[in-house]
Amino acid sequence: MKNLNIIDSVDVDAGADDPCVYLTFDDGPNPFCTPHILDVLAQHAVSATFFVIGANAEVHPGLVQRIVSEGHGVANHTMTHPDLATCSRPQVEREIDEANRAIISACPGASIRHIRAPYGKWTEEALVKSASLGLAPVHWSVDPRDWSCPGVDAIVDRVLAAAKPGSIVLLHEDGPPGAADPTKLPTLRDQTLAAISAIIKSLRSRGLTIRSLP
């Protein structure tokens, strides 16, 4: 069945003429972090792909609109970020359908072509449902574990140690709904934000281009 293969990197022969790395951001939009991420991407004139949680898109539609208007990809990361392996088929289908609707409601002009399972945990039900909606399932090939707040240098070093042409880099702009201490939300992703410029500059110094997913 179409789109049942999970994408963890982009075939360099099928991609752009120049070697590319693909930055992706999960769990947003986040009113404290997403605007600053977008500012940094704009400063460097690069595009990325944002895997947004539908519940967050409902609360922050303006950020979804900004993501799209500034030329980035917006993608499905389910409605409430559950572990799909613990969900029934109807629950899986509802999570994916409702997230798509929330994104389109927030930004009617959005083109949703990709989906990423929360925690990277795919199920047959999720893959079949994604295929029925024409969504390509995306994993990642580079994970600096920025969600664990290991330090800016660690995030940068882990990306640079693993990145190569076609790599899909996993970063985060928020966390699962309700998972973080509310008092820490304003600074939750400060390390990720601080790392982005260094990552972009270093990848470019290697002759790599940063783009949103094709």
Curated annotation (Swiss-Prot):
Question: Which GO BP annotation is one of this protein's?
Answer: carbohydrate metabolic process
Q: Which organism was this protein described from? A: Neorhizobium galegae
- What function does the entry list? Is involved in generating a small heat-stable compound (Nod), an acylated oligomer of N-acetylglucosamine, that stimulates mitosis in various plant protoplasts.
Q: Where in the cell is it found?
A: Cytoplasm
Keywords in alphabetical order: Cytoplasm, Hydrolase, Metal-binding, Nodulation
| Site (Raises pKa of active site His): residue numbering on this chain | 146
Q: Which family does it belong to?
A: Belongs to the polysaccharide deacetylase family.
Query: Which named protein is this?
Result: Chitooligosaccharide deacetylase
According to the UniProt entry, what is the EC number of this protein? 3.5.1.-
Matches recorded under Pfam families: Polysacc_deac_1
Q: Which residues form the NodB homology domain?
A: 19-211
